[in-house]
Design a protein with these regions (language model features):
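Positively charged n-region of N-terminal signal peptides that target proteins for export
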Residues: 1-4
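Repetitive helical segments and hydrophobic/amphipathic motifs
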Residues: 11-12
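C-terminal motif of bacterial Sec signal peptides marking the signal peptidase cleavage site
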Residues: 15-19
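N-terminal export/targeting and maturation segments
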Residues: 20-88
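Extracytoplasmic electrostatic interaction patches
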Residues: 89, 93-188
Length: 188
């Protein structure tokens, strides 16, 4: 009997600690998700996006012991509108100018290793906004000249302390971060 109780408790603890990860891509819930998860300072409203031809929305919610929320909005444009939106983005956001570091227990870490990088066909720039705390709450804007697309990525996790150690490949770690939290490697 004790073994059964111990086994049940072990399974319950494992499930509780591993958490529940869910994803959604229903664009009809986008506005409510932005408000619910506190992304209003960074994520654009659909009405502010100009004359787009398509929009792809994705949210990843990890509700476990160490929760995190990742929101991805990729907007497609015709050529002329794309050029206008890219120009607008130059002043729509303030962008990070230097990588961000932190020291924990005599070890150096990057809370934001790069200010600009390329991944998944997009050239990303890390944004600065009112509630930015790298890497706990931040956003990135990605531009794909080849596809005429703009990606808005927002991340929040109160428990995320750093993206990579000082001696790791910064670009590879940012790509890994994007693939894990935003599923950028699964884009068609």
């Amino acid at each position: 009997m004790k073994r059964i109780v111990a086994a049940v408790l072990a399974v319950v603890m494992l499930v509780a600690l591993s958490g529940c990860i869910s994803t959604d891509n229903n664009i009809d819930r986008y506005g409510a998700d932005v408000v619910k998860h506190g992304a209003m300072a960074f994520m654009p409203t659909l009405d502010s996006l100009g004359a787009y031809t398509d929009v792809d929305y994705f949210i990843r919610m990890d509700e476990g012991v160490f929760p995190s929320y990742s929101m991805r909005l990729i907007v497609s444009y015709g050529e002329a509108e794309f050029k206008a939106e890219v120009k607008r983005l130059e002043t729509a956001y303030t962008y990070l100018q230097e990588p961000q570091t932190a020291d924990y227990s005599d070890e150096a870490y990057y809370t934001m290793p790069l200010t600009e990088f390329s991944a998944a066909g997009f050239d990303f720039r890390v944004a600065v906004f009112e509630d930015t705390v790298y890497p706990k709450n931040f956003g990135m804007v990605g531009i794909s000249q080849a596809m005429h697309k703009i990606a808005y990525l927002w991340f929040y996790s109160p428990d995320h302390d750093y993206i990579c150690e000082a001696d790791e490949d910064k670009a590879a770690q940012m790509t890994e971060f994007l693939n894990y939290h935003f599923e950028m490697d699964k884009l068609g």
